[in-house]
């Protein structure tokens, strides 16, 4: 039996100020799935994501990644297994060169020498950025920096790739290039986004989180075609966009 990449069971969480962000979330993501996490601002999406690699803990319920519980004793391995790509790549890139940024995670985990170099080269090749290895990240375009940010996570060979608004601030060509890269990866993907057409393009399954609970879970095309569901959870497609017209 194949172990799920992610299992969230009865997850509830309140912040120290008393704000209850999650109310008993249950979610299973199978290995290799690409799932869009949708919902309005304040729905609890960020709170859920921060539980996946143990940045937030102490609530009710449980989270397991490939069968390993997210717990203090396992945090080093959990953070290798769950790679988060932030919305702003400049929050993730801080070394003098692209190569050093991509090497940072594996090196911090103890990898050295030819093994480390091979890991860096592989990650950069997967995102089409190998030729920029010796460039300073701040000399790259925004789209290129986002691809390098993805490479920094891929260098850790994660079980799950979590992407926060991956299409934001990308021009059409960069958006297409990133989509092609994400489709090529043999990794479980959880994509947090307000870009509903991008979710439809990349993720066969979508989950709507609203007011701290899972409000809907199913094929992305079906959910986005349900006008009543979309209105109820403050989700809107671009003017004139018909999800049923998209050939998947």
What are the roles of these predicted feature ranges?
Residues 61-69, 78:
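Conserved ABC transporter NBD signature motif
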